[in-house]
Amino acid sequence: MEVLHKPVLLRESVEFLTENGGKIYVDCTLGGGGHAKEILKKRKDIFLIGIDRDEEAIEIAKENLKEFEGRFSIYKANFKDLDLVLKEEGIDKVDGFLFDLGVSMYQLKGERGFTFQEDQPLDMRMDKEQTLTACKVVNNYPERELIRILKEYGEEKFAVRIAKAIVQRRKKKPIETTGELVDVILSVVPEYYKHGKIHPATRTFQAIRIEVNKELESLKEALEKTPYHFNSKGRLVVITFHSLEDRIVKHFIKEKEKEGIFRIITKKPVTPSEEEIRENPASRSAKLRVAEKI
């Protein structure tokens, strides 16, 4: 699949990660290898461990990192299992973990239901081997559970209306494509909501994607494991794309600072420049936070 994915805050994240002069880094969201490539270019003695749940992205990354053969290992895994990956690699301590959260262009451009711009099967799985899909969430979850997900993970103010409409529609026939789900959403949200800054389906799609992939649980679990695997001055670098992720990261690094485990490097999150947002509108909501192991 020839899709060019533009890594967000690339220069800033790689600089923060590698400026400690370390030798072993973990890219917990390898994707197509955009960040990994820049990390490996930094110094010839760097070894990189890449983790991703997405088989297609891994194949693209292998191709993109060919010139660094022998200087990286790639694992198909959920980043919450980073401790198991390190054990398998025979490494206990590393100099940095990078997390670039959210959906990659490879997933948005594939026929996997991550986008509402095209009519695709309702899937949304980052790991195609897992059984829970967006279709199952939309057609099988009880109304109260749909409301909870839309409120909690989508921060959707019309969660009740949308959930009720989904339940009504699926009684007639299952909702099987992204287009059908968008139609349901558009049928119940007020007119003004259709002309806002973001598409009225954005929050619903985000909420369902987070539920399908258990994104927030995985993030919390992964972050909690990182302090046990840092060398001194190891860096934690995290790029988030919505307030739910950012809150989790902010809370985690503040807690670890209180416990005397981390020093916070970015007092305020780093955000993309106007130029980057112009070139890559998908970067507009990105926030970068960095902490260092004491």
UniProtKB/Swiss-Prot annotation:
Region (Disordered) residue spans: 273-294
Cellular compartment(s): Cytoplasm
GO molecular function: rRNA (cytosine-N4-)-methyltransferase activity
Keyword vocabulary terms for this entry: Cytoplasm, Methyltransferase, rRNA processing, S-adenosyl-L-methionine, Transferase
UniProt cross-references to InterPro entries, sorted A to Z: RsmH (IPR002903), SAM-dep_MeTrfase_MraW_recog (IPR023397), SAM-dependent_MTases_sf (IPR029063)
EC numbers on record: 2.1.1.199
Ranges that cross the membrane: none
Reactions performed catalytically: cytidine(1402) in 16S rRNA + S-adenosyl-L-methionine = N(4)-methylcytidine(1402) in 16S rRNA + S-adenosyl-L-homocysteine + H(+)
The keyword Cytoplasm belongs to this UniProt entry's keyword annotation: yes
Top-level division of the source organism's lineage: Bacteria
Any GO CC annotation of this UniProt entry: cytoplasm
The protein's enzyme class: transferase
Positions contributing to S-adenosyl-L-methionine binding: 33-35, 52, 79, 100, 107
HAMAP family, A to Z: 16SrRNA_methyltr_H
Family: Belongs to the methyltransferase superfamily. RsmH family.
Designated name of the protein: Ribosomal RNA small subunit methyltransferase H
Organism, as annotated: Aquifex aeolicus (strain VF5)
